[in-house]
Amino acid sequence: MRKATVRREFPNRIRVRLDEHQPVALWGENTETSMVNQDGVVFEANVDDIDADQLPVLSGPAGQSVLVWQMYNYLKPILATVSMGVDKLELSPRGSWRVQTDSDAMIELGRGTQEEVGQRLQVFLKTVAQVTSRYQRTTNSVLAADLRHTNGYALRLRGVTTLGNDGNKKP
């Protein structure tokens, strides 16, 4: 229950208004009961009452749910430009962002403001198709990406391995 209002009306009536939380995401490690509403506020509820499979999982330090919710809303349309969705968004205790896409790609976004993180992600999304096509892959083949580097990024693709100096394959 988000808010309950009780008013007395003349002559002998009582008007009760109940506002419920509308869950938009699951929160933290305890996704069985913790959820986030449209204002970024964490609340407790029974996850069985909603379709939890359709909700993203957000996590971060205590008291940072509003910031995480705002970043989710900022990153979601950026990823949508390449037909990717956000399954999970995490803010580490040290302030570093990590997103898991609906294709199970884990992208390390690093620290910074929304604009800084968003700019790194946009540069990555503009160039990743060129990189993946060199290996006859698509952007859905991205297994992991690390965007914390100053002038580039590290990328791991499904089905692509490297050879070490000894000729043995390395994942």
Q: Which stretches of residues belong to each language-model region?
A:
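Charged, solvent-exposed interaction patches on well-folded alpha/beta domains
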Residues: K3-P171
